[in-house]
């Protein structure tokens, strides 16, 4: 076997070793892209109830992850308070969650945040408030953005992702209209 043959054999051995060394216990990346089934992570509502993203199936849901200290989250919540009636009449439930640990910054509790920025609309039964688990936070916000939202169809598939809500509201409302028109509401 010449040098070329030995080199080819060495490459084959290295590729084989690398392929066989992949751990089957390594965490898998869970897709949060459009079309994917939303990963089933947990959160705690302000009423103290543990819930999962999977438990939201059955109707379209806007899952919005926020930090309670960011100004665009404040403005987005105020804007969403003006649209909650429209979203509810379209069959969309809103779940607004504080990112775990408020991404390491100090901000008001999600309950105080809701009252301050959503006002009376914070008590709307079509708007659930809570705190994301650490795993939900890292799964849905791996880049550590101050806010990000996901529109889920009634079967729990992600149909739209964007941020920040205050400046992308028209896109969100358009996505809701398309979801409703397509019979996924």
Language model features: what each stretch is:
Residues 1-38, 184-185:
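N-terminal targeting signals for export/organelle localization
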Residues 58-61, 89-95, 124-127, 147, ...:
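Loop/turn elements at helix/coil->beta-strand transitions in domains of secreted/extracellular proteins
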Residues 91-107, 122-134:
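Thiol-based oxidoreductase modules, predominantly thioredoxin-like and allied folds used
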Residues 145-185:
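Thiol-/selenol-based redox modules, centered on thioredoxin-like
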């Amino acid at each position: 076997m010449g040098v070329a043959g030995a080199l080819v054999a060495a490459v084959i051995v290295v590729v084989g070793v690398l392929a066989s060394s992949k751990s089957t216990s390594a965490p898998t990346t869970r897709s949060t892209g459009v079309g994917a089934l939303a990963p089933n992570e947990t959160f705690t509502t302000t009423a103290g109830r543990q819930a999962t993203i999977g438990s939201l199936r059955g109707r379209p849901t806007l899952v919005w992850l926020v930090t309670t200290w960011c100004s665009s989250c404040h403005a987005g919540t105020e804007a969403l308070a003006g649209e909650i009636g429209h979203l509810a009449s379209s069959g969309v439930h809103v779940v607004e969650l504080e990112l775990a640990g408020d991404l390491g910054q100090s901000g008001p509790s999600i309950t105080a945040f809701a009252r301050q920025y959503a006002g009376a609309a914070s008590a709307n039964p079509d708007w659930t408030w809570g705190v994301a688990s650490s795993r939900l936070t890292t799964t849905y916000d791996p880049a550590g953005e101050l806010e990000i939202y996901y529109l889920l169809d009634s079967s729990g598939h992600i149909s739209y992702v964007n941020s920040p809500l205050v400046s992308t509201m028209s896109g969100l409302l358009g996505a809701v209209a398309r979801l409703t028109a397509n019979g996924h509401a």
